[in-house]
Amino acid sequence: MKLQLMICLVLLPCFFCEPDEICRARMTNKEFTYKSNVCNNCGDQVAACEAECFRNDVYTACHEAQKG
């Protein structure tokens, strides 16, 4: 779990709640990178793009670390 949390903190700003328009733009683009894949666990604001973000292993590890 500590390793997952470290990966999360180093590669993905989990605390950053992106605006809806950015989320929608990334959903349209369908091309995710470490820098742009900043979906988070902030609630309904990003619910629409969380399914896409889960395709990224780093985000998945981050999400699991947040839950744990």
From Swiss-Prot:
Subcellular localization(s) per the UniProt record: Secreted
Main location: secreted
Signal peptide location: 1-17
Tissue specificity: Expressed by the venom gland.
GO CC field: extracellular region
A GO molecular function held by the record: toxin activity
Record text about domains: Comprises exclusively 4 tightly packed alpha helices (no beta strand is present).
Miscellaneous comment as given in the Swiss-Prot or TrEMBL entry: Arose via modification of ancestral neuropeptide hormones (ion transport peptide/crustacean hyperglycemic hormones (ITP/CHH)).
Function text: Toxin that paralyzes insects. May have a direct effect on the insect central nervous system.
Family, as annotated: Belongs to the helical arthropod-neuropeptide-derived (HAND) family.
Protein name, UniProt field: U1-agatoxin-Ta1b
Source organism: Eratigena agrestis
